[in-house]
């Protein structure tokens, strides 16, 4: 009972029995009471259970199906449908594999690490980041160009695991089911086809070092980063269930593929395929492990990245879509900023085409879009907060091409800023 019969009307907690005089707060419900201490205890229990669920990794029963994963990727990444399908299936199978590991089976399922091939700015990093967000797992990024094998100036491969551990708030269990994206992986290719007797500090040696953590090992991670030393305590992280996604532009790989598939005959009826016949992005879709071997990767490293996904180079149409369609589209972000100033921001179709063409000239893919917009919008974003009666700002192609000022529409008058 919530009211103790002790000759007084003193109320008590229905859970711990403490009276209202012994606690800070007593909250009443239908025929029951609960004190602030019991509420705090319940919160702690729920928080602990939530942490345990997160540590267990994504529940396969709640895990989005491949089609659902692709649908969410579509909201953030324009085009690249085939790559999205490959990623969705690989990620889904990866976490199904983790769930099956605790069950008796006569089949051993291999890890589905992924290799993403595609030009700069085609969406490789964004795809990996979005996957981690969908699955609610820790995510870390690393740049392969900074890595060297142990004992040389540079970053140890174990520091990649440290980044993931930090993303998981040093929860080792959660980190062990996270995703690591290694960018610029093509930069650690061997410098020549034949093994060298000299040390290849940032090439084959790094491949060998990465090989261990990608295939699964218990890594000793220095909690504060940096180089290892004997007096330092290490955190032990099992990388067996960490999904590794490696990405790179692989400049020159298209030539290797072209040499392999190109048919050359002499004399009449010669059937010669020109290198310009296919775009580099199309050629990359025909990549084989043998091509990667010739590019400079060791066979063991290629074998640990069994899933290949190719991203195509973005064209003008795709660039325009990227500007306005995704959930986090740049145009939507700028419009939201202006909306906070009670001003409508409009981009003409011509301005979107102009931004896209300027970005294509830079050959940095979608990465160039933001800097172009920042330069075009700087002055107007500086002025608008100080101006009154502004109703609308219109950005046309002249703002992009000729650095002209945007059109400002006031409450009753239209004039140039």
From Swiss-Prot:
A UniProt-annotated Pfam family: zf-C4_ClpX
The UniProt entry, under CDD domains, shows:
RecA-like_ClpX
Coiled-coil intervals in this record? none
User: Per UniProt, where does ATP bind?
Assistant: 119-126
Residues annotated as binding Zn(2+) are 13, 16, 35, 38
Gene Ontology MF terms in the entry: ATP binding; ATP hydrolysis activity; ATP-dependent protein folding chaperone; protein dimerization activity; unfolded protein binding; zinc ion binding
A single Gene Ontology CC term? HslUV protease complex
Q: Give the ClpX-type ZB domain ranges.
A: 1-54
Kindly state the subunit structure of this protein: Component of the ClpX-ClpP complex. Forms a hexameric ring that, in the presence of ATP, binds to fourteen ClpP subunits assembled into a disk-like structure with a central cavity, resembling the structure of eukaryotic proteasomes.
Family, per the entry?
Belongs to the ClpX chaperone family.
Q: What does this protein do?
A: ATP-dependent specificity component of the Clp protease. It directs the protease to specific substrates. Can perform chaperone functions in the absence of ClpP.
Give the protein's recorded name: ATP-dependent Clp protease ATP-binding subunit ClpX
Source organism per entry reads: Geobacter sulfurreducens (strain ATCC 51573 / DSM 12127 / PCA)
